[in-house]
């Protein structure tokens, strides 16, 4: 599978400090049999094709059919082992993103997951779920805060199935409380349209932003300060 488009998308969004608050984020591309997902420990801004991890979609699908123990420690240990067993990459030292299973659940070719300051100003805010529906509509799926790993994937699996029954289509935009945004589509161009649409709607709710031009000296410091002050401004300036 050609990963050049995935690499370009990853580098583009990963290079914008307004989209990757505190680093992090991940991306993927898939066909009917194989998922390529960002490797753990890599950076979106600089990731190369060889740093994505190849995984079997059939094995990932089997995880959703597995009956794991109720005990958190035992469940997550077995779940992690099954995720690693789904890795088909020739380089067995690679570890997939912790959200690989969630990427596999989306019924679209490309998936983008980032932590934009504007989005996190919403998802980390007071009354966020209600505000999300008010500003973005019901077709943006909201997921309440929960444990990462299998628990998150299971909840998303159930919510995504319920969404399809209600709307007659698959989820393309998903918000995680206190976390970030997932956007899925069959083309990178459509991901851009969906992502920009969310950002545009949130920008209209911002009453003011901070001026940090005199408070920083280096480029690195300025990027960090802009990310932080934008988040603080958005947390207090959105109509909560």
Model-identified regions with their sequence ranges:
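Conserved small/polar residues in nucleotide/adenosyl-binding loops
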Residues: 229-236
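Active-site glycine-rich loop that binds ribose-phosphate moieties when present
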Residues: 94-98, 144-168
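Histidine-centered catalytic micro-motifs
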Residues: 109-126, 177-180
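Short HxH-centered metal-ligating active-site micro-motif
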Residues: 61-117, 163-166
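Contiguous mid-protein beta-loop-alpha structural module that forms a pocket-lining wall or clamp
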Residues: 157, 161-212
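Class I SAM-dependent methyltransferase SAM-binding "motif I" and its flanking Rossmann-like core
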Residues: 117-152
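N-terminal low-complexity or amphipathic/hydrophobic leaders
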Residues: 3-80, 105-106
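Flexible, glycine/proline-enriched loop segments at strand-loop-helix junctions
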Residues: 85-92, 138-150, 181-185
